[in-house]
């Protein structure tokens, strides 16, 4: 009976596969949005103020950071939880693949969230004259919560490695 339960639990990892396929679809949508942003502002590039251009570039950076986060979660999650990718399938293997454990992934995700939040906060500061003070305050508080969480997770990870 135990063997059957263990096998069921082990094989249930494949339920994550459609999730990673869904993330791939999300990445495709994000890429489409990125190019939509470029196509939308290209005709206006010479008429727009520099501050608007900076906001558009910040939006593109935001999309790139989220895309990088998606790729990292898809690859490392697939390799850690479903199946190791074979070397013959991908000749140009990313150097971090196969080297990230769950804690490393969590720390990278937390760092990425802080970076994304920083870009979002910078965009809000650039539009401060059009943004309510209350919204700015809450965005700063939420950003600080992300930063503290990232530091806390990194500290806990470091402490658990020194005890081992």
From Swiss-Prot:
Keywords: Cell membrane, Membrane, Transmembrane, Transmembrane helix. Its main location: membrane. GO terms for cellular component: plasma membrane. It is found in: Cell membrane. The keyword rRNA-binding does not apply. It comes from the Bacteria. The chain crosses the membrane at residues 15-35, 53-73, 136-156. InterPro entries: UPF0114, UPF0114_bac. Pfam families: UPF0114 (PF03350). The keyword Nucleotide-binding does not apply. Belongs to the UPF0114 family. This is UPF0114 protein BCI_0033. It comes from Baumannia cicadellinicola subsp. Homalodisca coagulata.
